[in-house]
UniProtKB/Swiss-Prot annotation:
Family stated for the protein in its record: Belongs to the UPF0301 (AlgH) family.
Pfam family, one: DUF179
Record GO cellular component, one term: cytosol
SUPFAM superfamilies named among the record's database cross-references: VC0467-like
Name assigned to this protein: UPF0301 protein PFLU_5755
Annotated InterPro entries: AlgH-like (IPR003774)
Coiled-coil residue spans: none
Organism from which the protein derives: Pseudomonas fluorescens (strain SBW25)
Length: 189
């Protein structure tokens, strides 16, 4: 008998299908941080909010004026769960108080990474989010089976060097898919 292990999507992108009804995920590109039999966690990487790094730093260390460059560092809506919790995706390299290596990209969750970015000594490339997307055991698999998502291999170029408004289409193009031509209906010839 063949031992079949499940396929997990850690370190991949999820592309929301055009018919995605949930407003938290419609037209999103999500990076999957973790996916196991117990559930999944991801960060939406193409929805900037009105906040920028300077706004966050004013709350974290009000005694220091944030450098002007921090106004140009966007903060993304990472998902609907724990929207007051910050996550920073950045290239593997520098380690901070809470950094996890995710196969060529790192996830840092401690404030020191934000201070390092602000002070010009942190990662040069980053995606900063507030909140995350979470799925219970079997939930993401069920959504995939109902054609809510396409999966796409991770690409650091899309994450760090593609403007946020183009990331979804760039991931779809990597699969040679035009999202405007997709439907939620299956047909038979």
């Amino acid at each position: 008998m063949k031992n079949v292990s499940p396929t997990y999507l850690k370190h991949q992108f999820l592309i929301a299908m055009p018919h995605m009804a949930d407003p938290n995920f419609a037209q999103t590109l999500t990076y999957i941080v973790e996916h196991t039999a117990k559930g999944a966690m991801g960060l939406v990487i193409n929805r900037p909010q009105e906040l920028n790094l300077a706004d966050i730093l004013e709350q974290l260390r009000p005694e220091v004026d944030p450098p002007a460059r921090c106004q140009g560092v966007p903060i993304y809506i990472g998902g609907p769960v724990q929207t007051d919790r910050g996550f920073v995706l950045h290239p593997t390299g520098p380690k901070f108080q809470a950094t996890v290596d995710l196969e060529g990209v790192s996830l840092s969750t401690s404030q020191d990474v934000l201070f390092a970015i602000a002070d010009g000594v942190g990662p040069e490339q980053s995606v900063i989010t507030l909140g995350y997307a979470g799925w219970e055991a079997g939930q993401l698999e069920a959504e995939l089976a109902s054609n809510a998502w396409l999966t796409c291999p991770f690409d650091a170029e899309i994450l760090f060097n593609t403007p946020s408004e183009l990331r979804l289409e760039a991931a779809a193009a990597k699969l040679r898919v035009n999202l405007n031509l997709l439907t939620s209906q299956a047909g038979h010839a």
